[in-house]
Amino acid sequence: ARRRRRSSRPQRRRRRRRHGRRRRGRR
């Protein structure tokens, strides 16, 4: 899992991700 840094200002919007890895190309 990825750790997020706590931001100084509270987050108003939540972003919803459906499929976590959607990147083009292969790793």
From Swiss-Prot:
GO terms for molecular function: DNA binding. One of its GO terms (cellular component) is nucleosome. Testis. The keyword DNA-binding applies. Residues 1-27 are annotated as: Disordered. Keywords: Chromosome, Developmental protein, Differentiation, DNA condensation, DNA-binding, Nucleosome core, Nucleus, Spermatogenesis. It comes from the Eukaryota. GO terms for biological process: cell differentiation; chromosome condensation; spermatogenesis. The keyword Nuclease does not apply. Protamines substitute for histones in the chromatin of sperm during the haploid phase of spermatogenesis. They compact sperm DNA into a highly condensed, stable and inactive complex. This is Protamine-B. It comes from Acipenser gueldenstaedtii. The lineage of its organism: Eukaryota, Metazoa, Chordata, Craniata, Vertebrata.
